[in-house]
Every structure is written in structure tokens, then in C-alpha cells.
Amino acid sequence: MKVTLFVTCLVDMFETNVGKATVEVLERLGCEIEFPEAQVCCGQPAYNSGHVEAAKEAMKHMIETFEDAEYIVTPSGSCATMFHEYPHVFKDDPKWAKRAQKVADKTYEFTQFIVDVLKVTDVGASLSGIATIHKSCHMTRMLGVKEAPGILLSNVKGLTVRDLPNVQNCCGFGGTFSVKMTPISEQMVDEKVDSVMETGADYLIGADCGCLLNIGGRIERLGKEVKVMHIAEVLNSRS
């Protein structure tokens, strides 16, 4: 099975270990990984900021880059969601809407692909400690991926998963929201950190690097001792 990896901007620039872990997990599960070097941003920041025409140019480039893939997998619920929004963005342009739908139909978030396509619930990972899961907004509310991360983590040897209080609440990142609405964003992430600390977890695990960078940065500034990990890193653990 050939998987074309969309690595995302944040992974490429800040969290390269997440990209490496994603590839290694999928390869162990029998996937052949392709990485198109022509890939760029999915266009979400520009689109959400109202720069629709600029965003469309990035989206067209991504459609051209990925439309011949067998499966498209990304370690980001938010970016996967954006791919699924492409047909809506191009709804008034039948030619591009058709090509966008072709891409959207074969785009999966990392854990969604493992559970729903590969039909795997145990990847053989092991990690000792207590964890809690942050469920990112786009991934759960728009993409509809709610259970796959928990299913996979429940089978990680040595890991106990505790429910995160107020799990439905946003962490305050929201891409450009955290820049435009900084005071509100700071209050939201403080509330999220309080919820994490309430669980007594050793690890905070999530599937979107934006959320994890936001929460992790606040945890570090507050001097809390919780390790923040992307779920790909956890599923690649052998400890």
C-alpha cells in the first residue's frame, strides 16, 4: 500500500521527530511512503485570515501535487480537515471542485488511517506512565475523528490513559487566533493546562502540533513537569 505523506508546516519546521515517527510507524505497518518535495502549506492560515485568493493558489498547488496519490496521510487533524474543505472552497469552480474532491476523498489523519483503513488497533508500542489526551477542535468537530487516538493509546503497553477534564474545550491556539486574540488565547491555554495538571499525567498526548506547541509552551513557562508528545511519537515508542 502506497502512502503519500503530507508532513505539514509545523512538523517540517519545528517538530521533525513527529514526521520521522509517522514514517517509521507506517512503514512497520507495511506501507510504502512517498514524500512529494513540491508540497507546501495547505493554505489554512491564509484562508482563515481572509486571504482567499492567495489561499486558493496554495490549494491548487497541493491538489496538483497530491491528486495521483493512492492514500494521503498527515499527522495533523487540522491540516487533514483543510484538505476536506477544498471542495467547498472551489464549489463555484467545477473543474477544481472535482479535482479537490478527489484529493479530499483519500486524505486521512494519521490515527484515522491506522484504525479505519489499515484496521490496526495495536501497533506494538510501549511507554510507561500516565497520559491524558488533548482532542483538537478541527480533528474532532470537523473531521469527525474522535475515537481513533484513544483506541491506539489504550493498547500501548505500560501506558495508563486518564480522561482530560473539559476535553471539549479549545486550547486557545486556533492558528492565527492566538496571534489576533492573544489575551483570550492565553486564558484558554491556562485553563487547558489546569485541566492537564488535574489528571496527574506524566504525558500530554495530542495529534496536532499547533495545539501541542501552544499547550507545551505554556506548561514550560509555568514550570510544570509534564512531557508533551505527538501521538506518532508515542506509537513509535519502545520503552
Curated annotation (Swiss-Prot):
One Gene Ontology CC term in the entry: cytosol
Domain of life: Bacteria
GO molecular function: oxidoreductase activity
Gene Ontology BP annotations: lactate metabolic process
Signal sequence bounds: none
Coiled-coil blocks: none
Family statement: Belongs to the LutA/YkgE family.
Function: Is involved in L-lactate degradation and allows cells to grow with lactate as the sole carbon source.
HAMAP family assigned to the protein according to its UniProt record, in alphabetical order: LutA
Record-given protein name: Lactate utilization protein A
Species this protein is from: Bacillus cereus (strain G9842)
